[in-house]
């Protein structure tokens, strides 16, 4: 089972520091967002060509190259609709061909066979390969995909599932169209809970309802299903079964696996985001430093025992400075290692 981290802020802005920590943590994989809206700020003339002038892959190239130098695999998340392709980053592209061709260009660039010449004074080099791909992030959460629900005549349906079926189908088709082989594309990346309340001020979709509707929406092909089984409150351990039937945490991950089995057969499961915030500084959701370290071991044990889980990705290497953000890192915002850092180092891979 691959164990790794997801921390775009540190990986992109403090790359050398981040990879020193990842290497020390014995990370086997790092999740990296390829922001479509940032890479392609204008419509490319030849969208299937990774070298089209509209594309700016500089930051992604650097991170992928550093991961390869440190012998860490990359899980690349394609997310974010550009303004030229749709209304907003968290909206369905107007043309799914645009997303499919971007996914193709990204997978071709990071196929392990693509040659680039950074400048006249630098030699031609081959970019490293990325074999693990993820379509979008938490599409059952309105922060990442809108609208969540839509009314048809007298009934409501989770529009997010229908839109996401198109998104993941486009990413899957684009990545696999390279023909290089070995790539795996995960769909889902679902958040742990949702209210299924279309009339509420902030409607969202529970993961079991979401995956049930994905099948009806026409999603047929994907290589693995991804989920983010976060705890509901700080009193829950990784083994705690949540009270709400709308939540899928690590404690009841079996209900999601059984649902997937009934709809898609025995798909592999990727945990592409997980973590526990600490107190200090988070007094509402945080647990003690010692508890966070203990839960690292417990979460790893649950995931390994499940056997269908291929990876466990912890959210954040370093705490975010703003208290409204996340403090689930294994390093504090001031740069001090928490006990959970040592817990990751001691995990038996």
What feature does the model see in each segment?
Residues 19-25, 29-111, 126, 153-188, ...:
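Aromatic-lined substrate-binding rim segments of carbohydrate-active enzymes
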Residues 41-46, 86-89, 145-149, 236-240, ...:
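Short acidic, glycine/proline-rich loop/turn micro-motifs
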Residues 2-4, 174, 325-329:
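Glycine-centered structural positions embedded in regular secondary structure
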């Amino acid at each position: 089972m691959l164990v790794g981290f997801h921390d775009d802020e540190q990986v992109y802005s403090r790359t050398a520091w981040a990879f020193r920590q990842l290497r020390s943590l014995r990370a086997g994989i790092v999740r990296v967002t390829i922001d479509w809206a940032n890479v392609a700020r204008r419509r490319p003339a030849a969208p299937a060509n990774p070298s089209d002038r509209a594309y700016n892959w500089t930051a992604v190239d650097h991170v992928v190259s550093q991961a390869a130098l440190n012998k860490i695999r990359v899980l690349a998340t394609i997310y974010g609709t550009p303004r030229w392709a749709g209304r907003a980053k968290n909206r369905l592209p107007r043309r799914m061909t645009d997303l499919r061709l971007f996914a193709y260009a990204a997978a071709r660039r990071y196929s392990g066979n693509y040659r680039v010449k950074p400048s006249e004074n630098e030699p031609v080099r081959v970019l490293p390969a990325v074999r693990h791909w993820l379509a979008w992030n938490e599409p059952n959460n309105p922060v990442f995909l809108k609208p969540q629900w839509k009314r048809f005549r007298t009934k409501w349906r989770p529009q997010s599932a229908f839109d996401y079926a198109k998104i993941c189908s486009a990413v899957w088709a684009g990545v696999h169209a390279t023909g290089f082989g070995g790539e795996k594309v995960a769909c889902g990346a679902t958040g742990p809970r949702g209210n299924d309340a279309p009339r509420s001020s902030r409607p969202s979709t529970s993961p079991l309802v979401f995956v049930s509707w994905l099948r009806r929406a026409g999603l047929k092909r994907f290589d693995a299903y991804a989920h983010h089984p976060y705890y509901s409150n700080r009193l829950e351990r990784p083994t705690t079964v949540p009270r709400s039937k709308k939540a899928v945490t690590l404690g009841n991950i079996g209900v999601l696996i059984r649902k997937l089995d009934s709809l898609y057969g025995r798909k592999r499961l990727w945990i592409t985001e997980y973590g526990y915030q600490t107190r200090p500084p988070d007094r509402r959701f945080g647990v003690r430093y010692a508890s966070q370290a203990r839960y690292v071991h417990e979460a790893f044990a649950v995931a390994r025992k499940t056997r269908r889980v291929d990876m466990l990705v912890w959210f954040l290497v370093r705490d975010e400075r703003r208290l409204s953000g996340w403090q689930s890192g294994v390093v504090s915002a001031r740069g001090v290692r928490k006990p959970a850092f040592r817990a990751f180092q001691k995990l038996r891979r």
